[in-house]
Design a protein with these regions (language model features):
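Trp/Phe/Arg-rich N-terminal binding region typifying the photolyase-homology
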Residues: 1-148
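Glycine/tryptophan-enriched, flexible segments
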Residues: 132, 136-201
Length: 201
């Protein structure tokens, strides 16, 4: 069994790491509520993030699976879950910001992991860091093949039950609807009505 560790990627479709994990073995999806991240986010950001986790949990249940939600240090919590479910590897989508990289490094130092490129179309490490012009960067970027990940099969997701709730958080304003479906709807609306008037910068 594998564990897939959700972080910024609160979606099941179009998720390279999840597709890679489920393509190899039965996969247990997990989200860790990290107190260190909580300290760095504003109240509205935090509430919106947890709403997204809640929607993701619902989407997994729609597929007959479950998103396990735990709170604490990711390395500790993932280690406990890997031991409890006899998982041999933790998959995740690679981060590029300092806090995310630091958090992932702690997990790498503790567990057997597989980092997958997902948040960007091309992994920056695949490109020359010494470009003298944007046109050369663009040429190299275009030359790298990009294809959407396969959709994970519901049969590859673990059939477990877990009643641990997503923590509650209040915001002082009405927040937009969270989750993949709502985000996709906003994106489609922009393509239909907003892109023609969007300023080219």
């Amino acid at each position: 069994m594998h564990v897939f560790w959700h972080q910024r990627d609160l979606r099941i479709p179009d998720n390279s790491g999840l597709a890679a994990a489920t393509g190899e073995d039965t996969t247990l999806p997990v989200y860790i509520v990290d107190p260190e991240l909580r300290e760095r986010l504003g109240t509205r950001q935090w509430a919106f993030l947890l709403n997204g986790v809640r929607r993701l949990k619902e989407r997994y249940r729609d597929r007959g699976s479950e998103l396990l939600v735990r709170e604490g240090d990711p390395a500790d919590e993932l280690g406990d879950l890997a031991a409890e479910y006899d998982a041999d590897r933790v998959y995740y989508n690679r981060h590029y910001r300092p806090l995310g990289r630091k958090r992932q490094q702690r997990v790498d130092d503790t567990l057997s992991t597989e980092a997958v490129t997902d948040l960007v179309l091309v992994d920056p490490e695949a490109l020359d860091p010494r470009y003298s012009s944007h046109s050369q960067f663009y040429t190299d970027w275009q030359a790298i093949e990009k294809s959407p990940p396969a959709a994970p099969s519901s049969d590859a997701l673990t059939d477990v039950t877990d009643d641990t709730p997503v923590p509650e958080a209040e915001a002082d304003i009405a927040l937009p609807e969270a989750g993949y479906r709502a985000a996709r709807a906003r994106y489609d609306e922009f393509l239909e009505s907003g892109i023609e008037t969007y300023n080219d910068t």
